[in-house]
Amino acid sequence: MDSSYSVISKTSYVELQKPTVNGKPRNKLLPSDEESFVNDFDDARNGVGGEDADDLDFDVADYPLVHGKSSNQGSGIYGAVFNLTTSIIGAGIMALPATMKVLGLVLGFVLIILMALLSEISVELLVRFSVLYKSKSYGEVVQFALGKTARVLSEICIIVNNGGVLVVYLIIMGDVMSGSLHHIGVLDQWLGNGFWDHRKVLILIVMVIFLAPLCALNKIDSLSVTSAASVALAVVFVVVCFVVATIKLIEGTIDPPRLSPDFGSKQAILDLLVVIPIMSNAYVCHFNVQPIYNELEGRSPHKMNRVGRITTAICVVVYASTAVSGYLLFGKDTESDILTNFDQDLGIRFSSAVNYIVRIGYILHLVLVFPVIHFSLRETVNTLLFEGSPPLSESKKRSLGLTVVLLALIYIGSTMIPNIWTAFKFTGATSAVSLGFTFPALIALRLGKQSNSLSFVERSVSWLMLILAVVVSIVGTIGNIYSLESKSD
């Protein structure tokens, strides 16, 4: 039978939409009797609905029929794990053996576990309320809970923390490649002393050739592969340290380690005061949680919590292995940057080759970590200075301009700060502890009260984190001031 109808191509589609409302086109594809779905979400977002808000385990952005957008392909769980792990395992791992020297093996190990648990809880609370209030950045969820002033303060903390961490990375690269006051550099050992191992020139070359191209990328998902490589290099470092320490332990050539803190001198007590903030700095990754979540494929709080838990487990193993084996290897001679210890005879076969593998491998690791930390630094600076402007992904000129300025400032900072201990103890006592514990605890307590979505245990843990953060900040800052005064005397 003849028909005037034609076959529709399989590649064609028809989007059904309602007429315009108030002169504006509708993007929803839901009939009017299903609009309560969106209204229920908005009620939960605004604290209406009581305990139902706690069961909201989806991200509405995953429902393109509600927003009229197609879901973009993002990173998978393991890509997100690599990026979040890279945000944590950077230079902080280098200072952990020195903290173990001060705290002793028992207290040091306990603190590694405790800080990991508290950090993971704070990340999960941050994710929950970020999704509930549809926040796209750390600063946005802070603003929902605490107001605009608190948001600006949190963004300043991110800038100080990330900027300080990136300065530390450059200091480590300089220490290892060109040497420091008491340790010879890799280039000195290979080529002898010359212009090629001048610290400032070397750092500048590394920044221009290796760091700048990676930092110019506009999506954190683009760094998943380099993050995976950086985690692999960190694992190589840990395995080498652990194997060498085990060999020396079996041979009986390791001095007995300290199991508890030393309270025998004023300097020992001051060191004890400043290592707690350094330990609290070790797990801070909260500034990158939201960017990673935003690009997570099929994102939901449950999926992001899984990312966080896998990441925490990896970091605990890496941190504990590095801290214990590094301290066992070098004992009381453990430096604040343990990489500088790897320029001496380790007392095993192929010691020289092992030293080169460890130092060069970790420098490559830091080169790959650098752009991940820089990403959230640049985004935060952009938000603070250019509020209301289009995202950086839509403004290549502004993105490149910010990248150049930030890299220049970080380079200048690396030439002025003497060592990583100085940088870590100040950022750990101030910005890091605020980002990792103070703000997440305040967010949970304030928004949890509004939405009635915090259990008694969660509320108690939030108060514990807040009290701990305040105590660590006060004690760490006082310890840092006394430490500087004692050195000046």
From Swiss-Prot:
Pfam families: Aa_trans. It is a multi-pass membrane protein. It is found in: Endoplasmic reticulum membrane; Vacuole membrane. Keywords: Amino-acid transport, Endoplasmic reticulum, Membrane, Transmembrane, Transmembrane helix, Transport, Vacuole. Disulfide bonds: none annotated. The chain crosses the membrane at residues 76-96, 102-122, 156-176, 201-221, 227-247, 269-289, 310-330, 357-377, 404-424, 425-445, 461-481. GO terms for biological process: amino acid transport. GO terms for cellular component: endoplasmic reticulum membrane; vacuolar membrane. Belongs to the amino acid/polyamine transporter 2 family. Amino acid/auxin permease (AAAP) (TC 2.A.18.6) subfamily. This is Amino acid transporter AVT6E.
